[in-house]
Amino acid sequence: MSALVYFSSSSENTHRFMQRLGLPATRIPLNERERIRVDEPYILVVPSYGGGGMAGAVPRQVIRFLNDEHNRARIRGVIASGNRNFGDAWGCAGDVIAQKYGVPWLYRFELMGTQRDIDNVRRGVNEFWQQLPRSA
C-alpha cells in the first residue's frame, strides 16, 4: 500500500482519526515554516475550514504543501473531514482539492469520524491502491 498524508489543526480531530485508522501516514506540520516532501504516491486526508464556504476551505499548510510541485505530482486522491453543521459545504476542502488537481474525492467524514468511517476508509484505501496502475 502507498502513503497517506494528512493535516490536522490543533483541535487534533484529523490526527485522532488517523491514529485510529492505524495505517502508515505522514503529517503535514502545523508550523508553516516546516516543510515535508513525499516521494511516493499518496492520498491526502484534509480537514475543511472556513465555516462552510469554499473560500478558505483548504488549510494554508496544505496549500503550501501542494504548491511544492514535487508533492503535488504525487497526489492520487483526497479524503476530507468537516462538520455537518455546514450543510452541503461539509468536507468541501476535498471537493476543492479534487477539482484543482484532477484526483478523485474518495471519502468524507465528520470531525473525528466514527468506527464505520474508519472501516470504510481502511477498506477504500486498500481497494484504491489495488486498482491504481503501478505506474501512477
UniProtKB/Swiss-Prot annotation:
<dbReference type="InterPro" id="IPR004465">
    <property type="entry name" value="RNR_NrdI"/>
</dbReference>
<dbReference type="GO" id="GO:0036211">
    <property type="term" value="P:protein modification process"/>
</dbReference>
<dbReference type="InterPro" id="IPR020852">
    <property type="entry name" value="RNR_Ib_NrdI_bac"/>
</dbReference>
<comment type="similarity">
    <text>Belongs to the NrdI family.</text>
</comment>
<dbReference type="InterPro" id="IPR029039">
    <property type="entry name" value="Flavoprotein-like_sf"/>
</dbReference>
<protein>
    <recommendedName>
        <fullName>Protein NrdI</fullName>
    </recommendedName>
</protein>
<dbReference type="Pfam" id="PF07972">
    <property type="entry name" value="Flavodoxin_NdrI"/>
</dbReference>
<dbReference type="GO" id="GO:0010181">
    <property type="term" value="F:FMN binding"/>
</dbReference>
<comment type="function">
    <text>Probably involved in ribonucleotide reductase function.</text>
</comment>
